[in-house]
Amino acid sequence: MKSKSKIFFWTLFDFANTAFSVIIVTVIYSKYFSNYVAGGKNWLWGLSVSISMIIAALLSPPLGAIADVSRNRKRFLLIFTLISVICTALMFYVQKGDVLLGIVLFILANIGFEAGLVFYDAFLPNLTEKKNFGRVSGYGFAMGYIGALAVLLIIMVLLPAETSPDYIFYVRLSFVVAAAFFLFFSIPLFLFVSEPKLSLQLKKSAIRIGLQKSGRTLRALFVHKEYPSISRFLLAFFLYNDAIITIIAFASIFASKILMMTDEQIIYFFVIVQSTAVAGSFIFGIISDHIGPKKTITITLVIWLFVVVGAFLVQNVFQFYLVGLSAGLSIGSSQSCSRSLMALLTPHEREAEFFGFYDGLFGKSSAVVGPLFYGIIADLFNQRFAALAIGIFFLVGLIILQRVEVPKYKKEETAAEII
């Protein structure tokens, strides 16, 4: 590895940004907005998520191309991080009836969070040798889940009983805590992780060239089919990541409606998931470096198929916790190995551009399709059948993944030689 300290500082950003995804998207703000601010109108929360993800999906490919041309990935990451942090902190002022303010702040914060991931992921090929992509990517996701556990423990201590007259105030204060956590632990990356010096000379504006490159890449991938393995992988990733995002989004709803679990039980469930996700990220990261990310992803997708079948059959809280253990092992490893496989497939000096399609057009847009599909099945039948139906996405994604050809690499080949 080039520098263990730089890798550690890079993984700290994963540690930092999970404060937003856990507190705002998954556990606290989502319920606060739906039940308290919007008066139980859950569709408004779904609309907010969909709008933010669509915008982030459309922005990510051109932003990635611009970052490659301008060689300012860190600057772009800083800008989007600050947008997310500031808007998250301002959510403290969202109170009952402030629906428009709550929607706008969340959309901006989530765009900042999601768009920033394009530039964060694009650092990976510059940090380590190609043979270590799986392990380092796994470290990042493991740190993310450790961060999630840390911020959940802080919030559990911060929040009083739900019957307390100050409960709503401390819920709002938790948004400020999430913002501060995100900001503080992201600082080391900006101070200590440098970008490689590249010699591209620009005669046109970076924005113009970036947009042109983004258009050419889209045509190269899906019209001229110059990168068939990347095209197939992106399609497979779209499908199985869609399923993963949907399961995350509806896990608490499934638990409360099917098993009548309390909020406290649901929080403990997420603690279990995050804990096993840490182990899964480390274990499968090491496995990935030995057998390759494609085979490792295949293993995790098979586990996911067992998870959705388990959710369909589960009858009590204990069984649901066991399903959560399996999901936790798979969730971090599926995503970390996908990131390392994308890094292996991506042409050198075009990392941010291609990660723009990976994280953006295919990663973020999948957050729109899956939840809608789940909701329709749940309304037509029930939550159990909806969970089982999500297995279709895993199965088809698994089949397409097998057609992805992974390039061979030599053990002595370093990232410096690649890029």
Where do the language-model regions lie?
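Multi-pass alpha-helical transporter architecture, strongest
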Residues: I7, Y93, F181-F192, L388-I419
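Hydrophobic core of transmembrane alpha-helices in multi-pass small-molecule transporters
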Residues: C87, D98-G116, Q319-S333
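A membrane-interface helix-boundary motif in multi-pass transporters
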Residues: L158-A180, I376-F394
